[in-house]
Amino acid sequence: MKPESRQAVAHFLTAAGRELNAFLEGLEADDYKAAVQMIRESRRGGGRVHVTGIGKPGHVAGYMASLLSSTGTPAYFLHGTEAVHGSCGQLVAGDVVICIS
């Protein structure tokens, strides 16, 4: 690997690590626990998780829905724009919606 490529990778990883640390510092433990509890209760009642976002957050939402689904939590990606044009019909009482901005 060229030195400038190695330097670019190091710069990216440093920036990504800094952003991840800032994100983790901003998490409120009680809020996180409440969200997890909400998802658990929904699941027990037969509910599902819908994750939504538009643009880059939409890509993250799709990936998050996929991760949840592959680990046993019924989850779906709900496109933020299409949701207001009829796609909300897939939501039922007891479901949880996670919005990513």
Kindly give the residue locations of the regions a language model identified.
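Conserved N-terminal alpha-helical segment that immediately precedes and caps sugar-phosphate-binding
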Residues: 1-101
